[in-house]
């Protein structure tokens, strides 16, 4: 059955034409008022059923068995509509505060609504299906009457959508539907054989796992949760959404499920995206997240509003993995949209974190196994002018403990969101067909080890492509440009004019490359002053105005926060920074050096494939000097109006240098315990900063040290090992010292050429 809405009286018959075939009408009416409304509607409609039965009638089995195969089965119910609030169909606070479901009010309320406001009581009719068609879809498992009743409820839900809005797409009887499917039973048998466990036991455990995973989508819970959590973001930011991108997605969503994969910088990300989608009448996403946010009372409410809480760790639990894949496959098959955050947690540095592949693996397997024809991945960029939680994340990077989530944490977070701090931009990148992206010459996920390795490699490339597309639509904010300018100056303050002269070539570069940005706000003194003032209000920038004119600098202790804002945009400048470093290498070795730098930075930034990278870097080098391959690199940089390596890369290569030198100092025969080693890097890094060997405190980031350690592991430098490893560790540290020296040289060239702008002697 499919669904459609009909007028509350005098409507057409289902399908819009009369038929000689008998019709069974299943009435989903729980109260006397609803039964009377359905009866009244039926008296004025053209539909003339041969039988009218309650939806859960005990006699339905007999009626279906005795009726001809061409008998049409349809269903009707009363759709109770909430009062309009601000022109939409969501239940307002008066309807949700007493926890009364405005979409299924108590019988005492129903009579009053039908009498005083009859437009809120609309009868909807499901699109009919023949008994023969229903038997064909049944599959032979369980009661046929029970199957028909369930299909009728689903069809009625579809019939209500034009009235309620498409944001309310509600899954029903999910666990039951999954367990009744022939594919589920086949997979259970195969899994039981692999595990050597009784099939009944595996089925029981899988059912329990599904019960824990499956989220309902109560419209009341959606409205209550949205109303309760809206203060966490509504006052803090003005939302600017990519409406053109949404319209493209709407058409695609008619045929396929969409999987929204946003960048993750704030707890508010999912709330903002949900509001943007609801405002444009998209169905609410099933949001997959960690069970750390399932605390009472938000957790139980969120689970009823489409939030799927997943265990943080389930490494060897094959039954849980199976249940998760089956659930994702079911949601894809029914075209429910999904949402999760591939980075696995909020970015502590402001740039995208490396993606995690677990959920994407199960999704790709579900598509490959035929649960859905395809799913489209939608990269989403959510970019903030400012974030109050950036300070807490910066403290974590300095070694502070993360505050656990709970009611007191939520209250504190809400208090911090009461005042406006800027704009948030939500942009949608070009969607990616998962089936097409995973197509390859190798076998599928279930092939041999070689096929499986090739499949995993394709999956990683898909995840990286999502990240590249997010970066491609992420706008460069005015905040990012201002912090980029101020962090490039060591321990100095700048006048307003000096800040503007640093910003001008940055804006010109963005315009020349046609990159998305809000740099127009920085074209005037007033615009720059406003951005600096907003940063000063949040104690990121300090202003001294006791002299001839105000001067601006990063507030002491706020360098990691400033770097957070800067890092949201630096991916646009990486090619330029690498090109500058390449020019300071031996001309005979420049392409090899470019590839070495790409490998050095690949754990921090997302690069395209090597051929694309070579093409992009060639264009950047040619912009610096058409004869770059043999040119005197120092002379080329001396004549450049824009130098970026020291502003973009210094904190990253400084952190790598700390890690490399500590590894070189360690006995190669001893293991390197990650936590203790990162603690050591933090302590020694602070000493190096005090000695002037590091540029600034933004290098002392636990996340940057962790990325550098992953780089070392990729180079097989972690050990344990022998003297060869000790030598390779020393070589690694020497090479990084050379890279840092080149970055410092570029800093000195920039200071010399812009002495009057930056106030720094070379």
List each model region and its residues.
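Membrane-interfacial terminal anchoring regions of lipid-handling membrane enzymes
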Residues: 1-762
